[in-house]
Structure formats: structure tokens, C-alpha cells
Amino acid sequence: MGRFKCLVDSKEGMEKFRAKYRIPPNVGIRYAAQGKWVDDRKTGEVVIPIIAFIEGGMTIPMGTLTKNFLRFFRLSPTQCAPNMFRVLRSIKVLNERMNLNLTHHDVNWIYNLHHMKGQGYYLKSRYPEVRLIQCLPTSNKGLKEDFLIFSRGWHDGLPCPTKEGKPGGGLTVNSYALVCILLSFPLSMFLTKFFFIFYFILMISQITVPPNPYST
């Protein structure tokens, strides 16, 4: 049992949690321990670590910055280390207090996505001298052992991935498919750039097409 189970292990506790984090009444919530949510999660449901709410500013429906970041990298919330939720929350606060419009692209420009076995994906500053967020904890031990499973209206129509994925994974389309696409256009469009296209086809042997991480 994780350290956060006591917050939601009773009906009264769950109601307080729902009220504190402003989770809509039409959203279903139930607790799942580490290693249990894989079998407990049903189609259309999402699993989120409790630490994401306590320290990561997670909201239901999910905030635009967090949702777009997860969609961009094809990650589910269960794959993210607490460090990632802290960074995204801090950037959200910067947007609100300083009237900024930082997006997941800005996050990706400053931070690199790394994976640590047993910990999940986390964010590391590309350059130590350039950091949006300071004083992040160096240890996440014991913080990702409690999860909540959300059902029904947990998203606004554009959900984040609910199944664990892998950044950069996907199906491949070889150069033959690329040639077929190019030949579907009038030849006159390419005559003046023939050598460029020929070089382009030779250099690109395959194109990565992202899988559909939103199917359950």
C-alpha cells in the first residue's frame, strides 16, 4: 500500500479528494494499487497516479498543456515520473500568473525526455544553465504506488493516451510508398526540382507513422 491510499480509502475520503481537486460529479473514480490497475482498467478509462494531483496540478478534464504533451509523445499518465508532472504544473502556473502562452513545444525545446527503468519517463534540462523550474526533488521513491482510475467524462472530447506507448514507435512506410505519392501529382510540378526529389528519395528509406495510442 502506498502513502496516498489513506486519502481515498473511504467514501468520505474520496468525496474530499473530489472536492479538493474539483473533479466533476459525473466522472467515475476508483482506487487501484501499483500493479493492479492493468487488470482493473476497462475500455475508455484512464489511470492517473495520485501524485499527479498532489504535486503535479493534474485536473479533470485534463489541462491542455499536459494533455498535448502526452499526446505528442504518445505516453499515458502511468508512464510519467512525478518529476514530469511537477514541471508541467509549474509551467501552467507561469502561464497563468505571467500571462504567457508556453506550450508543449516550448517544454520540448528546453527539456529532453528521458526514460529510467522502473521510474518511467522524466524531463531533464537540455542545458543546465537554462531551466524554467528550479529545486526539483532528486528522489521519487514511494510516490508512484497509488493510482486512480477515471471513467465517463474524464476528458473534454480529445483524450490523452490511455494505453502505454513509446515515443517514436510506429509503422513504417518504405520509399516505394513515397514514390507513389509523388507520382500522383502532375509531372510538370517536379521537373524543375528533379534532382532534389531524387536525392530526397534516396536519403529517406522509410517514414515513421505514429500508431494510434488512443484506441483501447
Predicted regions mapped to residue ranges:
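Residue-register detector that marks a fixed positional context within folded domains
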Residues: 1-216
